Swiss-Prot record:
One of its GO terms (biological process) is chitin catabolic process. Disruption phenotype: Leads to decreased endochitinase and exochitinase activities following heat-shock treatment. GO terms for cellular component: extracellular region. Induction: Induced by chitin and cuticle and repressed by glucose. Protein expression is increased after host tick Boophilus microplus infection. Also accumulates in response to heat-shock stress conditions. Belongs to the glycosyl hydrolase 18 family. Chitinase class III subfamily. It is found in: Secreted. The gene is chi3. SUPFAM superfamilies: (Trans)glycosidases (SSF51445). This is Endochitinase 3. Pfam families: Glyco_hydro_18. PANTHER family: ENDOCHITINASE. InterPro entries: Cts1-like (IPR045321), Glyco_hydro18_cat (IPR001223), Glyco_hydro_18_chit_AS (IPR001579), Glycoside_hydrolase_SF (IPR017853), Glycosyl_Hydrlase18_Chitinase (IPR050542).
Amino acid sequence: QAAPDEGRASGHKLTVYWGAEDDTTTLDDVCNDSSYDVVNLAFLSHFFSAGGYPKMSIGNLDGPSQAQKKAGATGLQDGSSLVKSIKNCQSKGKPVILSMGGATDYSDVQLNSDAQGQQIANTVWNLFLGGTDHKELRPFGDVKLDGVDLDNETNDGTGYLAMTKQFKANFQKDTSKKYYITAAPQCPYPDQSEPLDVCQLLDWVQVQFYNNGNCNIAQRGFAKAVKNWSKGIGSGVQLYIGALASGADGDEGYVHAATLNRAVNQVKAMNLPNFGGAMLWEAHSAVKNGQLPEED
């Protein structure tokens, strides 16, 4: 039970990453679990890959479709096997968000200019969200994902503000649905990879309170980091407490359920104006480790 069981009724939510690990936990498993409110698909790992298109690294998908191959976009994946599951999730009111980035050993989401940032926002808009260019290349066909999550861990935020503004402008073009833009910065405050001027424009920020020593959950600097992040992103942006669902992958800072519940209660007691809930990395390890949250 790695997440708080109380308080969800008052609007506190649980987001979870899925796709980067072993696929024995399916997207349907995650979407059908009432504990989870939002799924982050991990990952769109490279902004510029074969043919100038992005590269996807979603674990249980195969290679590119015929149309993608023909266009030279061989870093894209044929996501048709996930379409039904994504629709299932969305039908339950659970947004499915494309997370872009990940650990730097496996990704490259560095930008060298504002123009590149705007270009990526347009490319991703067309391939995954409400855009209509490159229809034949869309990994999930006519399914529109619900937004993007910025998981830049390069320590270089160049172009991210321009990209974020372009995403938000694109979102306005499709009034048929609500789109979200979020980020997952590291807990040392502030984070160069996800600059504050970017975070202040987002719907929520799910801070990784792990892999970072002093500001990890239950460490000495945790409370101060939470307060700094809450204030820095502004009261209009929700703050989620990011936690590991297991210590199995060599990640550092995993805490047992009771400790995480204590930490979340500690945050609740701060009465922050923008506390939104918790985030878990990662769905497969949560199941494997028996770390699913308690039901309300």
